[in-house]
């Protein structure tokens, strides 16, 4: 039997991604540094962007969908006067404008971009169109016609105006919201054009900048051994934002072995914030997280167990 390559390590590492690297480049580099068998990231960042890139190792990869569904916090710099084909500073200029909106004009336009909105992704994105990546089509001169997609924006505020050509915005959003599209569209709504000149991700689900380390701080030991797993956060860290449900040892054992538990046995313990018809909880056996469980049809069912 072919032996699997790498060490079976489990946990999360939050990298402060430098500008110029793709998210895949960062994952591959970190995976080599730790000699890890299995790794993946919790949400793509554009190459231009900096900030939080959570990387899951081993069992933590089971919790990636919950990180990707979590709230993200960003700050981006809008450069006014030039539209670019990529909607960021790396693209070619396709349109210019001399209009420079006032702060009041921006603030008047912002409410239309908050809440549940429809958003057209950038043509340079990883979305597939008839089996092809949109960015591959765009690079070949076949700009894809991308339909609007649902997006949720919880916060979108103007936070600084360094000069007439530049505006800085803070955003909190759900999964799959493109900052480049927000920048493009807020400029259009104010009668001008613009693109993202800088972008930083400040938070992903339960992870904040306090959890992040720089990529160049991960170095092999003197004997060239892999980086220490002591740098990793526990697998359960990713689930900190999900309401906890206290279980008996017997209930935890049943769920861990794939068996459902009746909600009638859990009455009075289900957190108020959880929908008993379709909610997700973090199952706790004492201080130990056993995994994620779903409330469904009168039962608590195992969803992703650790």
From Swiss-Prot:
CDD domains: PseudoU_synth_EcTruB, PUA_TruB_bacterial. It catalyses: uridine(55) in tRNA = pseudouridine(55) in tRNA. The active site is at 46 (nucleophile). It comes from the Bacteria. It holds the Pfam family TruB_C_2. Keywords: Isomerase, tRNA processing. GO terms for molecular function: RNA binding; tRNA pseudouridine(55) synthase activity. Its EC number is 5.4.99.25. Coiled coil: none annotated. The keyword Cell membrane does not apply. GO terms for biological process: mRNA pseudouridine synthesis; tRNA pseudouridine synthesis. Belongs to the pseudouridine synthase TruB family. Type 1 subfamily. Responsible for synthesis of pseudouridine from uracil-55 in the psi GC loop of transfer RNAs. This is tRNA pseudouridine synthase B. It comes from Gluconacetobacter diazotrophicus (strain ATCC 49037 / DSM 5601 / CCUG 37298 / CIP 103539 / LMG 7603 / PAl5).
